Amino acid sequence: MANVSFLFVVGIAIGCCTAAHAQPVPPPVVGDISVDPKEAAPLEEVRKLIAAGRSKQALAFADEHLAKNPRNAQMRFMRGVILSDMNDNDRARAAFQQLTEDFPELPEPYNNLAVLYAADGQLERARAALELALLARPDYATAHENMGDVYLQMAADAYQRASTLQPTNRAVSNKLALTREMVTKARTPR
């Protein structure tokens, strides 16, 4: 993903199991779609507005641009990221879902959809979205990392259930402690 100028990873599952843990980061340019030179300036304007913390203005600009250019996948992706940054997760989820339907070959919308699912505790849906991201691009390192985070959270949940059922099982207690430690370390901003 050499042409990605920014990376949007909110720390799937363990880094954003609640909205309070979400760490909004400027969005990437969708890697598999080349930028039409006339589209570069509007994308850069949105990036600048996002970087300046002016999400509402960035959203308005993106919406205005998309009214004239509804198939612009990069601007649509950025719109989803802006909505996510604004904690408008229902609309962000809808934006990323529509992108996956219109551009199933792009892994980034699946990844961001997975981030939102994980933030809501929907780990199975997050896992499924990440599988589709990896199907679209098997070498997408961010999706692999996020898949590991989802599996780690799933493991912690399973060990917690096992510990509740068998509170004296030392092996389960040790595994639960290890996964909790890993979850805590993974939440540390990088």
Tell me the role of every PLM-derived stretch.
Residues Q23-E39, L152-R190:
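Terminal, low-structured helical/coil segments at or just beyond the last alpha-helical repeat
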Residues E39, A73-Q74, P107-E108, A141-T142, ...:
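Helix-start (N-cap) detector for alpha-helical repeat units in TPR-like alpha-solenoids
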